[in-house]
Amino acid sequence: MKVLIVGGGGREHAIAQSVAKSEKVDKIYCTPGNAGIAALAECAPIGAMEFDKIVAFAKEKEVDLVIVGMDDPLVGGLVDELEKAGIRAFGPKKNAAILEGSKAFSKDLMKKYNIPTAAYENFTDPDAAIKYLETEAKFSNCIKSRWTGSWERSFDLQYTGGSKRWCQRDYDG
């Protein structure tokens, strides 16, 4: 079996190590990969968000299974595109990946269905977030960015000044 892993971080390296142990796997590809993954797989310089190129590469190499490890291509719908092209893929489709891709969506869903979760608030305005921190927040704050990315943007801020600076920076982009 030929396997393509999409991503180039530690998660994808761990996936490549596990896949390499299978006697059923003859060849591993990775896009874009990294130096560590290159010891286990043939890496191709295709970005994780270049869906058309990933689909074409998978077809060209006659890949049997694509494993999508990174959040951004999952949230963007790569699994949907692969399946549309008749390529087997492991990972959630776009409509399910939003659970990982949007902390606000996930928290709102948990609240709606009474699923236990830590207290939270969602803000789209930095001034409203800062006002909440100054008047309502009673404990140290864990602030999560609204963006997915190659690394999780989450900060445990012990004092309001740091929380306010982080909010302003995140909203400024």
Please provide the spans of the model-predicted regions.
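ATP-grasp fold ATP-binding core
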Residues: M110, E134-L157, G173
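Short, glycine-/small-residue-rich phosphate/pyrophosphate-handling segment
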Residues: G101-Y132
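ATP-binding N-terminal substructure of ATP-dependent carboxylate-amine bond-forming enzymes
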Residues: M1-K94
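Residue-level detector of structured alpha->beta connecting loops
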Residues: E62, G86, N114, A137-K138
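Short beta-strand-to-turn element immediately C-terminal to the catalytic PLP-Schiff-base lysine
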Residues: G7, F123, F155-Y159
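Acidic/polar helix N-cap motif
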Residues: G47-E50, S102, D125-P126, Y159
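Conserved ATP-binding module of the ATP-grasp superfamily
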Residues: L65, P116-A119, K138-C142, Q158-G173
